[in-house]
Curated annotation (Swiss-Prot):
Residues 1044-1307 form the Protein kinase domain. Its EC number is 2.7.11.1. The gene is Map3k19. Residues 85-119, 250-274, 330-363, 396-472, 486-508, 576-607, 734-767 are annotated as: Disordered. This is Mitogen-activated protein kinase kinase kinase 19. It catalyses: L-seryl-[protein] + ATP = O-phospho-L-seryl-[protein] + ADP + H(+); L-threonyl-[protein] + ATP = O-phospho-L-threonyl-[protein] + ADP + H(+). Residues 250-261 have a biased composition (Polar residues). Disulfide bonds: none annotated. Gene3D superfamilies: Transferase(Phosphotransferase) domain 1 (1.10.510.10). Residues 262-274, 330-345, 450-464, 734-748 have a biased composition (Basic and acidic residues). ATP binds at L1050, G1051, R1052, G1053, A1054, Y1055, G1056, T1057, V1058, K1072. CDD domains: STKc_YSK4.
């Protein structure tokens, strides 16, 4: 909307209050117009915290631009506004009589009685509701709260109003749930009022019986729009919560106010085509409050249309402290029932002005209002809801909630928005938001069809600026406003009893909620909207017994009202408690008090975000009125967020304490028990958890950013604590320290030096976190001797996740944490109870090479005879050996020279991992390390973060390490003296399976080498000198532990998978792992025995063309064979990469293959599986034969000796199998010659013989003794073809041997 020129100020400003406090009511010149009565009620307290209540100015043309300085009034003023006359309809006496009934009843909580209209005039429906806290919801010493109604009626014109009638109704507010709606508005130029999805409410000052004054306002008829003759009288009715059945009241329409006239009677400039729009209409009064129209649908009531002429009588009753909700109803010309919309308030912030004696409403533009649906035949119906809401200690709960889902976006005619400006001293802006509260109970079915016609309301943020130039905004007729002020009420007697019930002191605040409601014409609905309505109706039924507690406290200040954590669960986003359903939940973010004066344009999306995990709200007991709800909005961070007001007083400064104090802890503990049941657990988008109550002060950010609706999952996923998190302060707040202001926009939880977790800026603190924090706050600091690990169930969220993190990343620990649960380590365990980690399955874990450049090795602690030392004591649960049976006994032998030469120790507790480095010259089998405090311990005990705790733990660790080292040295000395290296050769068994002692006399020493938890057995006599050097002589002599890391897969075979590994010595190795079938114990033992024989055979093979064997390891049911790594890959891979090989190349390769096979045959070893995949190529061109284990297994034809087992074992190799192997006619050395011929054919052509056949077909072809094998292509030389023909001789007895083939002419070319 374009900016409009600023109109002049006129004395005809709406709601002008007489300048003399004691003067009689002013009577203005009354033309032939209607007068609207307005009444002001004063209070004994100041309306403003800073200045006198500014009188209102009567708006009329030609008046002075500024009003005089009037003294403060001590009595109320009744204001009568006149409107141009219009044809009125006649009201039936029956309706008048029914509408004049006034009921005043006191109700106990959760009981609601309808309130009848007053009996003096046609009740247009203004009834105010004072919502106050109930004893069941608030911890107050007052009795049950009352609902004080204020009835305002329109009566025939008269010069001055008399306060003869007042309608009041007492009713306790029943627990209901208010529903919120975000509203949208367009941006308008500077110094205009900006709207956003926020609001700020201030509690009302005390109200009492106040004197009344009345004056008449004349609103001149606007000549700019004479064609608009429709008038509308907004009817105000008592908005009683939990009205589950409609209140039937007769209502007649006296006039329909023309929207264009309404605007132009107040402002002289602006567009002519202003029409009322149900969703954006706003009333503006001189106290800087806007009266918005809300197109909300609520309890529909049947109001017979009646005609009413002249003036309507307005009357107000006494107030009780608490928010007053005024719901306005629309009047229709015809007899169709109209909708009574209720519980929809526009919370308008109170404007205070310092140093000025008068307040002016400034506006930059007029608003173009459009009647959405119902302006077409029977006139515009605009329900107006005036809601006077007190923030302090109030419970506002509508009976049912309406869904915004079936509201239709206004069309082009109804898209205009209302823009206006206001002012506030000291550049402190207060913002407003418009909640939507529409109960879904309708008395008339046709009225329900109008739900689809509701326009989308928009949240408005109204920063109040210093402005003294009054400009009138386009308004609809203002019906009634109650202003708290000073003095005593002179109202009728029946209103006074309700005022006498008021016992608690009120707090300084002036807050108004005024909403404009629209009445929809049921005749305008179409089929589509009816369908939408019917679908919406089924979803918009909320439980009537839902309850929301409100907590608020106000800090008085000299210049402004400091809002302390005002919480309106049904109106704001701040309420973290569960909500009935995501469908019913619409929340508008809280307005931040510190937001700057700037226009904000919200999104086009009018529907607020819906919580994904909304739960049923359960009633809870909130804290007292003085208690500040510590659950803060992430955009509402201010001084009061860090300090809690202890003694709240209406005057004078308050006493505050920080949140971390015992007082806060006590309050939080109480609140945790009281509110645990209805708090909603929210989650943030990146699955992150808030573990701290502290949130950063983000006033600069929230002034420029729109509040976002964030919800947490119901099951909190704790964040990963970072390395800086201390053990002592992990997950809880120290009680002697308050929360810090944490700035920044961290996306992940980060830890502060004090151990607190900083949460992302958009996260809310969930109730689950609150409970955890409350559980942790009172915990005193534990000394290292007292910090015994608690059970997992007692740990906080942070501790539990930290434990999981540590166990997963660092691979540590068991329940006994620091030391292994060995017989002699129980004393060290008692000395180290401060281990913070919880049980994992493995007792020990090795710090991998990525985390530590040093290796750790086990330590022996028992000094017992060698024949009674069990494997667990000798190798205590280290590297997956933790599950060794305690009953298993193994004989242990160590070389005396090995131990004696390597007994020196260098315990260095100050090292990073409290582990000694592995020197190749030192024997590390008898040294244990406290890997419990490995890298994790260093991270937890970082001296920069907790020096005292680190020093204590370091001291304890030093003492324990020294004691254990001394003990271990003695143990090793004794064991060394008792060991006999000539007789004992031992192997540690897995899971208590003892390996038989090698009884034969031999100089071979079974060397246990730990390679990634696997034991490698090396026999010294089979290793050549070069290989000994490669594997390090010291490792053979001193049994050095070697670790390896598994890498990528090099290949897969029928019997296992080959991996590339990197040892701790920096060597690349090939590790073949074969899985053993453990289902049959006998078969497994037999298979293992055969594999052991095969391994023993392979260890004897030392040839340049045979891959070097390094060792084996049996881990559970997996056998690992460690071999020399050949980086060039297999011949098959070379063929795949480069194609068929040239004759000279494969001739050279064939010669080396034959040399290796000849070596095998000389040692009575038959490979039986020579093929391209089992022939490896070194980068230097050296050929290596591999996979001897599979060849040996093929000779046995499977464990059971059946053909099926053989076929299974032969999968993938039938093209290279000799006929005798397939026929199982007997194995011999000549079978390898057949395989060599097939391999040469593969190198020459790229594929083995019979590759065009299926595997099974090829096997039958080869074994049938009928078909001839294909020869080499003609492009190869004759010697090459003859060599292949000889190798593929079907009769194995006629086949040449390897030595004979080495003399073949084909191989002579390669020499």
């Amino acid at each position: 909307m374009d900016s409009m020129p600023r109109p002049e100020r006129h004395a005809e400003s709406l709601l002008d209050i007489c300048h003399e406090a004691g003067s009689t009511p002013m009577e203005m010149t009354v033309s032939q117009t209607e007068n609207l009565t307005l009444q002001s009620i004063s209070s004994s307290e100041d309306f403003d915290l800073e200045d006198d209540f500014s009188p209102f100015i009567l708006a009329r043309e030609g008046a002075a631009p500024r009003g005089e300085n009037w003294p403060r009034r001590t009595e109320g003023v009744e204001i009568i506004v006149t409107f141009p006359p219009d044809p009125l309809q006649e009201a039936s006496q029956e309706d008048l009589k029914e509408s004049n009934q006034v009921t005043s009843e006191h109700q106990e909580r959760e009981q609601v009685h309808p309130v009848s209209p007053p009996d003096d005039a046609e009740m247009v429906g203004l009834t105010g509701r004072m919502l106050t806290t109930q004893p069941s919801l608030l911890k107050t010493d007052g009795s049950s709260e009352e609902l004080c109604g204020v009835d305002v009626a329109l009566s025939p014109p008269r010069p001055c109003l008399d306060s003869s009638l007042a309608a009041s109704a007492a009713g306790e507010v029943a627990p209901c749930v208010l529903k919120e709606q975000q509203r949208q508005s367009d941006e308008f130029p500077t110094s205009d009022i900006s709207y956003s999805s926020r609001r700020t409410g201030l509690p009302l000052p005390p109200l009492s019986c106040l004197p009344m004054r009345s004056c008449i306002f004349n609103m001149e008829k606007s000549p700019k729009s004479p064609r608009h003759r429709e008038r509308k009288v907004p009817s105000l009715s008592l908005s009683v919560p939990k009205l589950l059945e409609p209140l039937s009241r007769p209502l007649s329409q006296s006039a329909e106010f023309s929207s264009s006239k309404n605007h132009q009677e107040v402002t002289q400039e602006g567009p002519v085509e202003h029409t009322l729009r149900g969703s954006n209409c706003t009333l503006w009064s001189r106290n800087m409050c806007s009266f918005r129209k809300s197109g909300k649908q609520g309890v529909a009531e049947s109001w017979p249309s009646q005609e009413m002429e002249g003036w309507d009588k307005t009357k107000t009753s006494g107030f009780k402290e608490g928010p007053s909700l005024f719901s306005c109803e629309s009047v229709k010309e015809d007899t169709t029932p109209t909708e009574r919309e209720r519980d929809s308030g526009y919370h308008v912030s109170e404007m205070q002005r310092g140093g000025e004696d008068s307040q002016y409403l400034s506006s930059r533009k007029k608003e173009s209002w459009t009647a959405r649906v119902v302006e077409r035949d029977s006139g515009v119906e605009h329900p107006i809801l005036c809601k006077l809401l007190e923030v302090s200690n109030s419970e506002m709960t509508p009976a049912e909630e309406k869904e915004i889902g079936n509201e239709n976006v206004p069309d082009a005619k109804s898209n205009s928005v209302h823009k206006s400006g206001a002012m506030e001293p000291h550049a402190a802006s207060e913002e407003v938001s418009v909640p939507k509260n529409g109960p879904s109970v309708n008395s008339d079915g046709p009225a329900e069809e109008l739900e689809g016609h509701r326009d989308i309301e928009q949240n408005r943020k109204i920063p109040m600026e210093e402005e003294t130039n009054p400009e009138m905004n386009g308004v609809v007729p203002l019906t009634h406003i109650a202003f708290p002020g000073e003095g005593t009420s002179k109202g009728p007697a029946r209103a006074e009893p309700h005022l006498q019930r008021r016992k608690r002191p009120a707090q300084n605040s002036n807050s108004f909620n005024l909403l404009a409601h629209r009445e929809h014409d049921k005749l305008q609905t179409n089929t589509h909207r009816t369908k939408l309505d019917s679908r919406t109706k089924a979803r918009n039924r909320a439980p009537p017994n839902l309850m929301v507690s409100i907590q608020a406290s106000i800090k008085p200040n000299m210049h402004k009202n400091s809002i302390k954590t005002q919480v309106f669960p049904a109106l704001e986003l701040i309420d973290h408690r569960p909500h009935p359903s995501s469908k019913f939940q619409r929340r508008a973010p809280l307005t931040e008090k510190k937001s700057t004066h700037q226009t904000q344009k919200p999104k086009k999306q009018a529907f607020p975000r819906i919580g994904k995990h909304a739960g049923i709200k359960k009633p809870g007991i909130p804290l007292s009125a003085e208690t500040t709800d510590p659950r803060l909005h992430f955009l509402d961070l201010k001084y009061s967020d860090m300090f809690k007001e202890i003694n709240s007083a209406s005057n004078g400064p308050g006493i505050y304490e920080m949140f971390g104090t015992p007082v806060y802890c006590h309050i939080r503990e109480a609140e945790r028990h009281d509110h645990r049941c209805y708090r909603e657990i929210r989650t943030a988008p990146s699955g992150r958890c808030v573990v701290n109550k502290c949130q950063s002060s983000e006033s600069d950010r929230c002034s420029n950013s729109r509040a976002r609706l964030l919800q947490k999952r119901q099951h909190i996923k704790p964040p990963k604590p970072l390395h800086g998190l201390r053990q002592k302060h992990r997950g809880f707040i120290s009680k002697d320290k308050g929360c810090k202001d944490m700035g920044g926009h961290t996306e992940d939880s980060v830890s502060e030096p004090d151990g607190q977790m900083k949460s992302p800026g958009n996260d809310f603190l969930s109730s689950k976190d609150d409970a955890q924090l409350m559980h942790l706050i009172p915990i005193p600091e534990l000394s290292p001797e007292q910090k015994a690990p608690a059970p997992v169930s007692d740990l906080s969220i942070v501790e539990e996740i930290f434990t999981e993190e540590c166990a997963d990343e660092e691979g540590i620990l068991n329940d006994d944490s620091l030391t292994q649960s060995l017989g002699d380590l129980k004393e060290p365990e008692g000395l180290h109870p401060q281990a913070p980690l919880v049980p994992s399955e493995n007792s020990w874990a090795v710090l991998s090479e990525k985390r530590s450049g040093k290796r750790v090795s086990p330590e022996k602690h028992n000094v017992e005879p060698l024949d009674k030392i069990n494997a667990e004591q000798m190798f205590p649960g280290y590297l997956e050996f933790d599950s060794l049976s305690e009953k298993s006994k193994t004989l242990v032998s160590f070389s005396s020279c090995s131990f004696q030469e390597n007994l020196e120790r260098a315990p260095s507790p100050t090292e990073q991992h409290w582990a000694r480095s592995l020197e190749q010259d030192s024997l590390e089998n008898n040294s244990t390390t406290y890997q419990t405090f490995g890298k994790i311990s260093q991270e937890i005990l970082d001296p920069g973060k907790n020096e005292e705790l680190t020093d204590e733990l370091l001291g304890c660790l030093v003492e324990e390490l020294l004691a254990l080292d001394e003990k271990d040295n003695n143990s090793c000395q004794i064991m060394t003296n008792e060991a006999d290296a000539k007789n004992l050769n031992l192997v540690f068994s897995r899971r208590g399976n003892t390996i038989e002692e090698l009884g034969r006399e031999t100089t071979d020493v079974k060397l246990q080498r730990c390679i990634n938890g696997f034991r490698i057995y090396d026999e010294e006599n089979f290793l050549t000198s070069n290989e000994k050097k490669t594997l390090s002589d010291k490792s053979l002599n001193h049994e050095e532990a070697i670790f390896w890391t598994k890498g990528e897969i090099l290949g897969r075979g029928a019997y296992g998978t080959v991996y590339c590994g990197l040892t701790s010595l920096g060597q690349l190795i090939a590790v073949k792992q074969v899985a053993l079938d453990t289902s049959d114990k006998l078969a497994t033992e037999k298979e293992y025995r055969k594999l052991q024989e095969e391994v023993d055979l392979l260890k004897a093979l030392k040839h340049v063309n045979i891959v070097a064997y390094l060792g084996t390891c049996l881990e559970e049911n997996t056998l690992s064979i460690f071999m020399e790594f050949v980086p060039g890959g297999s011949i098959s891979s070379i063929i795949n990469r480069f194609g068929p090989l040239p004759e000279m190349v494969f001739c050279k390769y064939t010669r080396q293959i034959l040399q290796g096979v000849a070596y095998l045959h000389d040692n009575c070893v038959v490979h039986r599986d020579i093929k391209g995949n089992n022939v490896m190529l070194m980068p230097t061109g050296i050929i290596k034969l591999i996979d001897f284990g599979c060849a040996k297994r093929l000779a046995w034809a499977g464990l059971n000796g059946t053909h099926s087992d053989m076929l299974k074992s032969m999968r993938g190799t039938p093209y290279w199998m000799a006929p005798e192997v397939i026929n199982e006619s007997g194995y011999g050395r000549k079978s390898d010659i057949w395989s060599i011929g097939c391999t040469v054919f593969e190198m020459a052509t790229g594929k083995p013989p019979l590759a065009s056949m299926d595997r099974m077909a090829a096997m039958f072809y080869i074994g049938a003794h009928r078909g001839l094998m294909p020869p080499l292509p003609a492009r190869f030389s004759e010697p090459a073809a003859d060599f292949v023909r000889l190798c593929l001789t079907r009769d194995q007895h006629e086949r040449p041997s390897a030595l004979q083939l080495l003399k073949h002419s084909f191989l002579k070319r390669s020499q």
